[in-house]
Amino acid sequence: MEKSQKVTVLGGGSFGTALANIAAGNGYPTVLWMRDQERAAEMSKTGENARYLPGVKLNEKLICTSDMQEAVANSDLVLVSVPSKSFGDVVRDAKQYAKPGQFWLSTTKGIDEKGFKLMSDILREELTEQEIGVISGPNLAKEIGQESLAATVVASNSEPVRTLVQDVLSCRYFRVYANVDMYGVELGGALKNIYAIIAGLASALELGENTKAMLITRSLAEMSRFAVFMGANPMTFLGLAGVGDLVVTCSSPLSRNYRVGFALGKGEKLEDTVAALGEVAEGVNTTRLVRDKSRELGVEMPLVEGLYKIIYEHFPIKEVVSQLMQREQNSDVEFVLPRSEAN
C-alpha cells in the first residue's frame, strides 16, 4: 500500500541508493536525486545503479532525477547522502525548494573543514524552519543492497523525525534504532573512518589478530575521549553508531577507508589509491581535521597523530608503529580510571 509521506534522497552514491530502494520498497513515494542527468536517465531505464551499486535491482517505483525542484519541493523527508566536501553546496542548492515542516537528515560520515562542522551543523544553519537529524551505523551499502541483515541509528531531538525514519527505512533485513545524541552518533560515523585506514594498514602488514583487537579497542577509547571534549555522550560510542560502525569498517575490505589503509600498507601511493576507488574515502581528510582539532583542544590522540605522520608527513610506517608502542602506558578505560591516576 502506498504511503502518504514522500521521501527524497539527495545523492546517487551507493548508500543513498540503498536507502532510497528501501523506502520505495516500503511503499513510500521516493525520489533519488543526482547531479548527472544522463546517469539518472540510465538508472531509470535499466533499474540499476551500475556505477555505485551494481547488481542490485532498483524498485520499479523509485524515481531517479537530476531536477532538484522535482526532488525536494513536495517531499516530507529529505535524506542528504553526498560527500562532506559537497554537502553544504547541495543543501544550499536545495533549500530554495524546501518547505517549512520538512524533515532533513544527513547520512554523510564526514566533517566540513570550514570551522570543523558536522553535517548537522550545516543543516541547522541553512534550514531554520525544518526539523533535522542524522543517520549512522555499521552500514556497508553493498551488503544492504544485497539485503543482508543490518541495522542503523537515527538520531534527532525530534520524536516525530525519529519515528518517521524508523517507519520509512525499517524492513525485514534492516532495523533502525533511535537516539537523541545527534552529535555523538554523527561523530562516531566521522571518526571511525580514520581508524579504518589504520586497520587496513595493520592488515596489509600482517600484524596479527592481537594487534587488530588492540587497535580497535584503543581506537574506541580515542574516539570516546575526543567526543567527550566535543560535548557528546560517551555511552553513544557503545552502540551501533560507535563500536558497531568501528568494528565493521575496521574489519571489512568493503570499507573504502580500510582499502585505502591496506593499499598504503602495501606501499601504494595515496593519490593512486584514492583515484582507483571511484568514491570518496572520508578518512583521509578527516585525519587532518581531527588531528588539528585535537591539538587545539589538548586531547591526546596518538593513533590519529601516527596516521597523520604517515599520510601527510610521509613517515615510514614501521617508525610510527615503533613510536606508538613506546609511548607512556596509561589507563585502559578512562571513565573508570582517569588518565591522571594511571600508572
Curated annotation (Swiss-Prot):
A molecular function GO annotation: glycerol-3-phosphate dehydrogenase [NAD(P)+] activity
Keyword DNA-binding: no
Pfam families found in the cross-reference section: NAD_Gly3P_dh_C, NAD_Gly3P_dh_N
Keywords: Cytoplasm, Lipid biosynthesis, Lipid metabolism, NAD, NADP, Nucleotide-binding, Oxidoreductase, Phospholipid biosynthesis, Phospholipid metabolism
Subcellular location: Cytoplasm
GO CC annotation terms, alphabetical: cytosol
Family (UniProt): Belongs to the NAD-dependent glycerol-3-phosphate dehydrogenase family.
PANTHER family: GLYCEROL-3-PHOSPHATE DEHYDROGENASE, GLYCEROL-3-PHOSPHATE DEHYDROGENASE [NAD(+)] 2, CHLOROPLASTIC
Protein's UniProt name: Glycerol-3-phosphate dehydrogenase [NAD(P)+]
Naturally occurring in which organism (per UniProt): Hahella chejuensis (strain KCTC 2396)
Protein encoded by which gene: gpsA
